[in-house]
């Protein structure tokens, strides 16, 4: 069985498709969703959303939000998304190193928080590259 999934930002529809399986970046870990899942509303962290249809995974980087799951329908409301385009592995690795260094050298809690968000995005980019290659 397949389920419907919609990914929405405040200003546009990112995708509206069907899926065999969805993996969401929850605040306490990944949330796997299959057809017939119990009704659930969950907060999402910055991370990688994975949508599987016909043995093909599609990754999307989410920047926090909410997901509503109702048996065969998943609605993802996010602040923003980052599209994965042809990013070089070496470039993504450099971004991860830069974000790690920014956390280590942060002098204020705001700088540390901003750096941690960038670290989550950089980690999601690397995970996404693995799905694209």
Swiss-Prot record:
One Pfam family hit: ATP-synt_DE_N
Keyword Lyase (UniProt): no
Domain of life: Eukaryota
Gene Ontology biological process terms from the UniProt entry: proton motive force-driven ATP synthesis
Intracellular or extracellular location(s): Plastid, Chloroplast thylakoid membrane
Membrane association type: Peripheral membrane protein
Listed GO CC annotations: chloroplast thylakoid membrane; proton-transporting ATP synthase complex
Family matches, as InterPro entries: ATP_synth_F1_dsu/esu, ATP_synth_F1_dsu/esu_N, ATPsynth_dsu/esu_N
Keywords: ATP synthesis, CF(1), Chloroplast, Hydrogen ion transport, Ion transport, Membrane, Plastid, Thylakoid, Transport
Molecular functions (GO terms): ATP binding; proton-transporting ATP synthase activity, rotational mechanism
Signal peptide range in chain numbering: none
Keyword Signal carried by entry: no
Main function: Produces ATP from ADP in the presence of a proton gradient across the membrane.
Assembly notes: F-type ATPases have 2 components, CF(1) - the catalytic core - and CF(0) - the membrane proton channel. CF(1) has five subunits: alpha(3), beta(3), gamma(1), delta(1), epsilon(1). CF(0) has three main subunits: a, b and c.
HAMAP family from the UniProt entry: ATP_synth_epsil_bac
Protein family according to the UniProt entry: Belongs to the ATPase epsilon chain family.
The protein, known as: ATP synthase epsilon chain, chloroplastic
Source species of the chain: Thalassiosira pseudonana (Marine diatom)
């Amino acid at each position: 069985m397949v389920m419907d999934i919609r990914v929405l930002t405040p200003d546009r529809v990112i995708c509206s498709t069907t899926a065999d399986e969805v993996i969401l970046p929850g605040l306490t870990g990944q949330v796997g969703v299959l057809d017939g899942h119990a009704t659930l509303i969950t907060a999402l962290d910055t991370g990688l959303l994975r949508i599987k249809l016909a043995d093909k995974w599609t990754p999307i980087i989410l920047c926090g939000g909410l997901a509503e799951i109702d048996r065969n329908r998943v609605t993802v409301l996010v602040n923003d998304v980052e599209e994965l385009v042809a990013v070089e592995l070496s470039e993504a690795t450099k971004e991860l190193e830069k974000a790690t260094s920014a956390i280590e050298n942060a002098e204020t809690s705001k700088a540390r928080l901003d750096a941690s968000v960038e670290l989550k995005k950089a980690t999601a980019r690397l995970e996404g590259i693995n799905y694209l290659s």
